[in-house]
Amino acid sequence: MIFDDLKNISFYKGIHPNLDKAIDYLYEHRKDSFDLGKYEIDGDKVFLVVQENVLNKEENDRFEHHKNYADLHLLVEGHEYSSYGSRIKDEAVAFYEASDIGFVHCHEQYPLLLGYHNFAVFFPGEPHQPNGYAGMEDKVRKYLFKILID
């Protein structure tokens, strides 16, 4: 898991070629305004999903995880808590291979406050819980890069 200031994102180039593609795309298009939807960067290896999400104000003990894709979360409007889960307790919802998503319960969680100035990357196998209410806005606009880690 990576949580850092956006100005430092280039430090993470070299971890994986597909992560490099996402970082390069972000630099090339950082001043662009995207409509909601999916944008292919390198087919199914790297793509961007622009979302507007209503934040979850309820307590939630389920963490999503992926086997094949890393998620790079970057908010362009608003603030949210995106929690990192540690020490998986049990499976909450069976893994769905076609969508590369499953849900687990964790013994520990670490909330990360995301805003326009920072980002988080959750690698395959790392439980995370995006879209948590941060006590400010009720919804956020975010860029979610899906990055195949093979």
Give each language-model segment a name:
Residues L113-G132:
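Conserved metal-binding segment of the jelly-roll/cupin
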Residues I2-V49, K57-N60, H65:
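A short, N-terminal "cap"/entry segment at the start of jelly-roll beta-barrel domains
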Residues Q51-K67, Y96-Q109, P127-Q129:
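Short acidic (Asp/Glu) patches
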Residues N68-A70, L74-E80, I88-K89, Y96-I101:
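Glycine- and acidic-residue-biased ligand/ion/polar-headgroup-sensing regions
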Residues H79-S82, P127:
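Short beta-strand segments in beta-sandwich/barrel cores
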Residues F119-V121, E137-D150:
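A short hydrophobic beta-strand segment most commonly corresponding to one strand
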Residues G43, N60-D71, I88-V93, H107, ...:
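A short beta-loop-beta micro-motif enriched in histidine and acidic residues
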